[in-house]
C-alpha cells in the first residue's frame, strides 16, 4: 500500500474511533468532537509501535486545510451577528468574556515564568485548557514562523490533549460551584430572565395604540416625528371596523388604532406622544388582509435598501419586521436585504404574492450552496492571514495566519452578505457539515502526531504537571469572573452560565447550561452573544503570547 493510501486509511480509522469516543456520554456529558483528538492519540500510539510510515506532507496539508474549513465556516455562521454583539445590548456580557480571556492569558504567562515551561508546551496547555482547537492551530503556526523545531511544535498538540479533558469538566464544575456558593434557585432565575426580556432589552415587540393626542388629528403618518423615523413601523391601522395597511401619506384621526412594531423603549415613547395601549385586537383574521413570512432568495434584490423597493407604493404591502440569522430587527427603510432574510409582510393576499415573487421566496434555494463564494472567501482569508505586520523588536512578523485570516474574512463577508450576485449565505446543514469535516481532519492529524509519545509523557514525563497547569488556566478565570459577575453586576445565573460556556467556546458546557432549565433560552442567548468575539480573541491570544514570550526570552 502506498504512503498516501495508508495515510488516508489511518485518518479514516482515527475519525471512526474518535467519533465513537466522542459519542460516549457520562451523565449526559461527553467529549463530543474532542473525542477525535483522543482517537488520534490511540491510533497514533499503535501506528508508532508498528513502525508504520505516513506521508508527513499529506498530513500537514490535511491539518491546515481542516483548520481553514473550520474557522471559515464559523465566521460565516456568526458574521451577521458579530458586530451587533459588540453593541450596547451585549457589551456587558462581552466585557466579562474578554476578562476571562485576559485572566487566562495572565495565568498562562505566570505559569510559564514560574515553572519554566517550554513555550510550545505552555501554549498547548493554554489551548487545551480553554478547549479551543483553532487556538492550537494558530499557536502551532506562529511557532513555525518563529523557527521552532517541528518536534517541539508537535509537543503543543500533546500538551493540548493533556489539558483538554479538565477544560471540559472544569467549566461544568465552576457552574456547579457558583450555584452552591450563591444558593441559586434555577427556577427563580429563569422567571427573572423571562421577566427582564418582557419588560426591557432589545427585543422587538408589538403594541396597539389608540390615537388620543389632539395635535395628531388629521396629520399624515409621515408628519408624526415618532412614526417618521426608522425605529417604529406602523403596519396596520383600524378605523371603526375597517382594517388597512397604512402608508406614510395616510391621514390619522382621533380614535384610530395603530399596530406598531419596535423596541420596547421606542414603543413606550410612542405611547407618550400618541396615546395609551389598548387590548383591542388588530388581527387580520376575518379581514381581506393577511400576514406572511417571506424569504429573500432573488439575487436581483440583494444589497438593495427596503425603501428603494417601494413595496408600499407599488403593492400596498408593509414590511413589519425582519429576521436575519435568528436576530429580529425593525424593518428600517435603510436596511439592505441579504440572502436568507425573512420578512414579515402585511397586505392583501394578491399583493403579498406579488411581493413574494419579487423577493424570491424559493425555499429550495436555502438548501443550495454557492461554492464559488466559498472558495473566494477561503482564498481571500488565506491571503489576509499571510500579510506580515512588522513590529519593532519582535523576532518575527505578526500574521493572522491560517486560523485568523479566514476567520476575519468570513466575519466580514458574512456581515456584508452579498456582492452583486455572489452571496455568502450558507445553509446551516451545509455549514455544519463543512465545519465538522474540517475539525475532524485537523484533530485527527494532531492526535496522530501526538500519539507516539503521549503514553510515555503521561506515565514517565511531565504529563500530570501539565494537567495541573491546565486546571489552573481553566478554573482561575472562570471562578474569578463568575464571582465578579454575580456580585458586582448581579448577573442572572443562567445568563452567566451561557456567558462562561461561550467564553470557552465550549458546546458541551452550553448543553449542560441549557439542561439546567430546558425551557429557558437564557444560556443559549448569552452564549451566542459572546461567542464571535471570544472565538476571535482565542485565536489571536496564543499568537500574542508566543511572540511576547519569545521576545522576552
Swiss-Prot record:
Gene3D superfamilies: Regulator of K+ conductance, C-terminal domain
Family matches, as Pfam families: Asp-Al_Ex, TrkA_C
Bilayer-spanning residue ranges: 4-24, 28-48, 65-85, 95-115, 158-178, 371-391, 394-414, 439-459, 464-484, 533-553
GO CC entries: plasma membrane
Lineage top rank: taxon: Bacteria
Localization: Cell membrane
PROSITE patterns: RCK_C
SUPFAM superfamilies, alphabetized: TrkA C-terminal domain-like
Similarity remark: Belongs to the AAE transporter (TC 2.A.81) family. YidE subfamily.
PANTHER family: K(+)_H(+) ANTIPORTER SUBUNIT KHTT, TRANSPORT PROTEIN YIDE-RELATED
UniProt name for this protein: Putative transport protein YidE
Gene: yidE
